[in-house]
Amino acid sequence: MNHCELEEVTQHINNKISMIKRLLELRAVAKDPDKRGTLLKIGQEVSAINELLDRFEKYVGKQRDLLKHLKDLEGFFQEDEQDAYHLKNNTPPHMPKRGQQAAPQGGGQVAVQSRQTDAPAAPQEQGPPRKTQRNQIKEMEFITVPEFDSIPPYMKGRVTYDQLNAAVQSINTAVTSKYKILHQPVKTLNNVSRSLQQRFKDQETKDTKGHFFVVEQDIKEFAQLKVDKRFVGMLNMLRHCQRLKEVRGGGLTRFILL
């Protein structure tokens, strides 16, 4: 037995001796009738303190569980916050902004107000007011994420989801610009617009009757977009997603909206 172990044994024996002395003193006090009541009162208070300590221990355990639950909630909130920042910084450009009306589903019909002449309005006494003619222009619906994922990789290449929907927006711009001119009365058009309107009519065939379509020249002029090999690939993807079909004839390829 080394020196440290001997000191520990000595200290333990001394503690036991001190405890025995204290018990003997308390035993002598307990035999005194005057002090026995005080000892009983102290024992009751010690029991009450033990019960209170038990309650505190249970309360601390509940608070510990609550703290763990709050930390878990904090982790969930942090994940939601990160997701919100990700959505804010990666919102597709074709998504409508606050205060803008989203593009309608089921064919994407957009009302276009026909241009009125600068002639002064006739007085109400001369007859009922003339009704304003409204024409509906079809717009291509944007590609959804599941549709984009369904495109074969060999067809998709490096084109991203946002780039494909940007092409959809460009085609819609060309379609809207074309049919705004096409729906105007001839007398309200200038020479340039009149020539364009005649060109649009000459490009129509029996296959395009009742459909909205554009040609490559329309996309170049109205969308200010270069129809290169990459854009042609995106047209193939839109055809795969059943957004358009091609009709050839007369040296032109007509892209008909479905």
From Swiss-Prot:
UniProt keyword terms in alphabetical order: Cell cycle, Cell division, Centromere, Chromosome, Coiled coil, Cytoplasm, Cytoskeleton, Kinetochore, Microtubule, Mitosis
Pfam families per the UniProt record, alphabetical: SKA1
Regions annotated as coiled coil: 5-25
GO molecular function terms noted in the UniProt entry: microtubule binding
Annotated InterPro entries: SKA1, SKA1_MBD_sf
Listed transmembrane segments: none
Region (Microtubule binding): 137-258
GO annotation terms (biological process): attachment of mitotic spindle microtubules to kinetochore; cell division; chromosome segregation; mitotic cell cycle; mitotic metaphase chromosome alignment; mitotic sister chromatid segregation; regulation of microtubule polymerization or depolymerization
Cellular location(s): Cytoplasm, Cytoskeleton, Spindle; Chromosome, Centromere, Kinetochore
Primary location group: cytoplasm
Entries under Gene3D superfamilies matching the protein: 6.10.250.1370, Ska1 microtubule binding domain-like
Region spans: Disordered: 86-136
Gene Ontology cellular component annotations, sorted alphabetically: cytoplasm; meiotic spindle; mitotic spindle; outer kinetochore; spindle microtubule
Function per UniProt: Component of the SKA complex, a microtubule plus end-binding complex of the outer kinetochore that stabilizes spindle microtubule-kinetochore attachments, promotes alignment of chromosomes at the mitotic spindle equator (chromosome congression) and assists suppression of the spindle assembly checkpoint. Kinetochores, consisting of a centromere-associated inner segment and a microtubule-contacting outer segment, play a crucial role in chromosome segregation by mediating the physical connection between centromeric DNA and spindle microtubules.
Quaternary organization: Component of the SKA complex, composed of ska1, ska2 and ska3.
Family: Belongs to the SKA1 family.
Listed name of the protein: SKA complex subunit 1
Native organism: Danio rerio
Classification lineage: Eukaryota, Metazoa, Chordata, Craniata, Vertebrata
Protein encoded by which gene: ska1
